[in-house]
Regions:
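N-terminal, polar/charged subdomain of small-to-medium soluble alpha/beta proteins
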Residues: 1-94, 100-112, 116-159
């Protein structure tokens, strides 16, 4: 179980330094960091901005659960993640994750596991905007939308 508050969902700009500080400790010989950045294209379509929505309370609880799982499964690691919501432009950071461990391999593995679990389990929704309008990303059918918060865990394929 982590000592520090290590997860958040917020509208303000993200800081790599903040998540690194959350995982820094004397026994850590390596810290791995991942920052997910808004890019200007997705699957061949131009992207001008992203809108992220979340049920913040549920998202934070699930992120906290993921942190606890990883730290329990991979003894000796500490992980932290902050996800941004609201309107983000190209080049903005949407998520920052960090993991510390006694050795670099464990830090890289923990950081990768953290982002993978967040992307597959946390109820945060992404809408891409471009010259042709907007589209929700990752939703297979209309029942899976930000309006259906209770239905975010499903087996429709993409997460």
């Amino acid at each position: 179980m982590s000592i520090a508050v290590v997860v958040d969902v917020r509208e303000s700009a993200l800081s790599i330094d903040e998540v690194v500080k959350n995982v820094t400790r004397p026994g850590a010989g390596g810290i791995a960091v991942f920052s997910g950045i808004v890019r200007d294209e997705s699957e061949g379509r131009a992207v001008t901005r992203l809108d992220y929505s979340a049920y913040a309370g549920m998202a934070k609880r699930e992120m906290r659960k993921i942190v606890d799982e990883i730290e329990s499964e991979m003894g000796g690691v500490r992980v932290s993640a902050i996800h941004r919501v609201g309107q983000l432009g190209v080049g903005d950071s949407a998520i920052v994750c960090a993991a510390s461990a006694p050795h670099r391999d464990e830090a890289f593995r923990a950081c990768r596991e953290l982002i993978d679990r967040i992307k597959s389990r946390v109820p945060i929704w992404k809408r891409e905007w471009g010259p042709g309008g907007a589209a929700w990303v990752g939703w297979v059918d209309a029942r899976c939308s930000p309006a259906s918060v209770g239905h975010y865990r499903h087996a429709h394929g993409k997460s």
